[in-house]
């Protein structure tokens, strides 16, 4: 059974999470930054989940980790992400690569193969297949994962991107994304027609309210001027029908 906690106020309300999480809850899944682009209090949600013996799974934007708290430091047990932003163009929707990491106690439950760092006989850094299930080779139909060539190539592309950027480069990119998003929000809200829907801190995306309450007409005008304005949120949230 899956229970959804609404976050139409901008971020996930901790009190609402506490009401639905109990000793029978297997895991809590949260996205950070969330669908609205706002930054969640992951540490607080982690405390609520762990107090009931549940795991915390977090879906993240890899670029945001250049400036946001590391998921592990916030108490996250399993982290997943879409890796497209790590050096891969949009490519009309794919192929991309998925990212998954976990605490060491769960490593043997991860699908696929686990590569580990070691040294060779000349004390040079190298990588080896540390863990892999027999099914990967002898019973492919029962294997937990089969990574195809496309995903392998894009994983290599992401590895090259990360090695070139380095920690400081990732921080710079994350800061640039945030600065440009906040600049865009500042410029839009100088117009009487627009205002920010939420006061929460945001990373890339942000929600704008159309004070004239004519989102569809606004989107049509933007399209005619070759502008991809955003998603009309009323299709998911009735209370945000004037937002995008």
What is each model feature region?
Residues 1-128, 193, 208, 212, ...:
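Conserved PLP-enzyme active-site core in the AAT-like
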Residues 2-5, 26-31, 140, 162-172, ...:
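Glycine- and acidic
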Residues 86-192, 196-199:
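Active-site C-terminal subdomain of aminotransferase-like
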Residues 168-244:
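Conserved C-terminal alpha-helix-loop-beta "cap" of PLP-dependent enzymes
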């Amino acid at each position: 059974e899956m229970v959804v906690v609404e976050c139409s106020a901008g971020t996930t309300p901790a009190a609402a999470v506490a009401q639905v999480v109990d000793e029978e809850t297997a895991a809590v899944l949260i996205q950070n930054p969330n669908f609205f682009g706002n930054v969640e209090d992951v540490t607080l949600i982690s405390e609520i989940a762990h107090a009931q013996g549940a795991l915390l799974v977090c879906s993240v934007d890899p670029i945001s980790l250049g400036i946001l708290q590391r998921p592990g430091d916030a108490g996250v047990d399993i982290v997943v992400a879409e890796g497209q932003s790590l050096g891969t163009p949009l490519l009309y929707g794919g192929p991309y690569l998925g990212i998954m990491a976990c605490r060491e106690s769960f490593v043997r439950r991860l699908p696929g193969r686990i590569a580990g760092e070691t040294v060779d006989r000349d004390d040079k850094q190298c990588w080896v297949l540390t863990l892999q299930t027999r099914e990967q080779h002898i019973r492919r139909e029962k294997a937990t994962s089969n990574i195809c060539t496309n995903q392998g190539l894009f994983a290599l592309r992401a590895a090259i991107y990360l090695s070139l950027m380095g920690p400081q480069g990732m921080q710079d990119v994350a800061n640039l994304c945030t600065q440009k998003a906040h600049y865009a929000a500042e410029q839009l809200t100088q117009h009487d027609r627009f205002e920010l829907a939420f006061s929460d801190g945001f990373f890339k995306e942000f929600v704008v309210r159309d004070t004239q309450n004519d989102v569809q007409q606004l989107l049509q005008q933007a399209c005619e001027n070759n502008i991809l304005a955003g998603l009309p949120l009323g299709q998911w949230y009735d209370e945000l029908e004037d937002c995008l």
